From Swiss-Prot:
GO biological-process terms attached to the record: nitric oxide catabolic process; response to hydrogen peroxide
Protein's name in the database: Hydroxylamine reductase
Family membership noted in the UniProt record: Belongs to the HCP family.
Cysteine persulfide sites (modified residues): 405
Source organism of this protein record: Yersinia pestis
Cofactor: binding details: Binds 1 [2Fe-2S] cluster.
HAMAP family with a match to the protein in the record: Hydroxylam_reduct
Length: 550
């Protein structure tokens, strides 16, 4: 096993990365190694998809399958070895079918790629594990050096994050042929084990630019289906009655669950990155969507154990449900998996509903505690003139975007302290699950504008980017000239690709934490600082002084 993709990876003087029987996330060495094999198979599939495009063949099934299967290898998504193997088998079947179609047009065609003809050596996991050793991500690290290896991981993990957003968009009926073509090109290229520093850096930025377009179609899919988010009060305390908890990012799953639970007397609660759903008009119209439960994903083993109903996981993040003894009432969807728990293949949530009806639910309602969500793209753009007026009249000094991933590291208290320290003449935008570090605090208002604006899920960084672009256009300056600072927390691969997106757009002077990614060497961090001014967080006082100047 070798995995260095998340923030909690093992770090030692000898090197960074989880390389024992189990990773810090709970992923076994078996699952990790099989995921490496799956990635290699998917790289070969993408090589064929590129070749097919040259012949005018575009296989929409492959275009949707490839990023979905890649998504299953993200942190805290799928821990089920059998399902990882099934993805690899399906990929090879799709590749074979595509090759047949290509050879009907050109019987002599071959694909010049080291993984183009990769086959699984057997059906049994022990044999596949032996085969997977050929594709360990650190196999040639000693040969190419830490910097080249780190850049490869930056591209690979960034592309994983983009693949996740591609799948979220696909679920909502959104696709783009150019995006799929770029995805296959980057995926196939990574399978050649690239060694050129400039190419690696340029393609990392290319992946970021591609992801901007992915976030755009995802935003389009969400708003076309459910309307533009509106500022909405959300109760974060339990309400008496039977209950189902839904976690992850998939708004379509939430919509289907709300439809299927109408009239049952079951209350639906969001968790984690599903919180922003309350701002969408077509979702918040359901009266049994009663609130949000819990905090950051890392606390789920305690919080889920106390939840008196079934839990539906629609995407990341899932961690070991056996710790809290709730494995019998957690249900996984789509690419999510944990060995031995219930998995739903179709769109019928009847088993979940039946389980909820058989449980007690919450015995009483607690006193309401309301927070506000729903400051999405359109709401932010509509507020642009107000923001400009407040800045011009010197009533608004600075805007901070403080958000990103949450996690268990104690250093993450920095983000709570930072938000608390933001002066009263400044406002905070936040997004993703990092908001749980401070989103239940009362920040008040500034000239009628809430000082804390919850922009949405991690992919809603797109909304913040669009606001920054509009403000810069109206003020006749660059985004980097705005009184705007980004203080971002990262944990996994979606955060990596959002960072690449921001850098590819030329956004500079981003503060990141709580630690640097384990795959980025000191040399690479120095390059990112030199090119983009990106720097690790230090102390709240020091960083605030550097940003505001006093």
């Amino acid at each position: 096993m070798f995995c260095v993709q998340c923030e909690q990876t093992i770090r030692t003087p000898a090197g960074n990365g989880c390389s024992y029987a189990q990773g810090m996330c709970g992923k076994t060495a078996e699952t990790s190694d099989l995921q490496d094999l799956l990635v290699a198979v998917l790289q070969g599939l993408s090589a064929w998809a590129l070749q097919a495009r040259e012949l005018g063949i575009i296989d929409s099934q492959i275009d949707s399958f490839a990023p979905r299967a890649f998504f299953s290898t993200l942190t805290n998504v799928n821990f089920d070895s059998d399902r990882i193997v099934e993805y690899a088998k399906d990929a090879i079947l799709l590749r074979h079918s595509l090759a047949v179609r290509c050879r009907l047009l050109d019987s002599t065609i071959t694909v010049d790629h080291p993984l183009a003809e990769l086959q699984l050596v057997a059906d049994d996991i022990p044999s596949l594990l032996q085969q997977s050793q050929q594709f360990a991500l650190n196999n040639d690290k000693a040969d190419v050096g830490d910097d080249i290896h780190g850049l490869r991981m930056l591209c690979l993990y960034g592309l994983k994050g983009a693949a996740a957003y591609m799948e979220h968009a696909h679920v909502l009926g959104q696709s783009d042929e150019q995006i799929y073509a770029e995805y296959h090109a980057y995926m196939a290229w990574l399978g050649t084990q690239p060694r050129d520093v400039d190419t690696l850096l340029n393609n990392a930025m290319g992946i970021g630019k591609m992801n901007f377009n992915v976030m755009a179609i995802l935003d389009q899919g969400e708003t076309q289906a459910y309307g533009d988010p509106q500022p909405t009060s959300v109760n974060v305390r339990p309400v008496a009655g039977k209950a189902i908890l839904i976690s992850g990012h998939d708004l379509k799953d939430l919509h289907m669950l709300l439809e299927q639970t109408q009239g049952t007397g079951i209350n639906i609660y969001t968790h984690g990155e599903m919180l922003p759903a309350h701002g969408y008009p077509e979702l918040k119209r359901y009266p049994h969507l009663v609130g949000n439960y819990g905090s950051g994903w890392q606390n789920q083993q305690t919080e889920f154990a106390k939840f008196p109903g079934p839990i539906l996981m629609t995407s990341n993040c899932i961690i070991d449900p056996n710790v809290g003894n709730y494995g019998d009432r957690i249900w996984t969807r789509s690419i999510v998996g944990w060995p031995g728990v219930n998995h739903l293949d179709g769109d019928n949530f009847a088993p979940v509903i039946e389980q909820a009806l058989g449980m007690a639910g919450f015995p009483y309602s607690e006193l309401e505690h309301l927070i506000t969500v729903g400051f999405g793209r359109q709401t932010l753009l509509n507020a642009a003139d107000t923001v400009i007026d407040l800045v011009a009249s010197k009533k608004l000094r600075h805007v901070f975007l403080v958000g990103g991933c949450d996690g268990s590291r104690t250093e993450r208290s920095y983000f709570t302290d930072f938000a608390r320290s933001v002066p009263q003449d400044c406002i905070i935008m936040t997004l993703a699950c990092g908001k749980y570090r401070f989103n239940k605090l009362d920040f008040g208002t500034l000239e009628g504008l809430p000082r804390l604006l919850d922009v949405g899920q991690c992919n809603d960084a797109y909304a913040a980017i669009m606001l920054a672009v509009k403000l810069s256009e109206k003020l006749g300056c660059t985004v980097n000239d705005l009184p705007l600072s980004l203080v971002l927390s990262w944990f996994e691969q979606k955060a990596i690709v959002i960072l690449l997106t921001l850098l590819s757009l030329g956004v500079k002077n981003i503060y990141t934490g709580p630690t640097a990614p384990g795959f980025l060497t000191d040399n690479l961090m120095a390059i990112l600082y030199e090119k983009f001014g990106m720097q690790p967080i230090t102390t709240v006082e020091q960083d605030m002084q550097a940003i505001l100047g006093h």
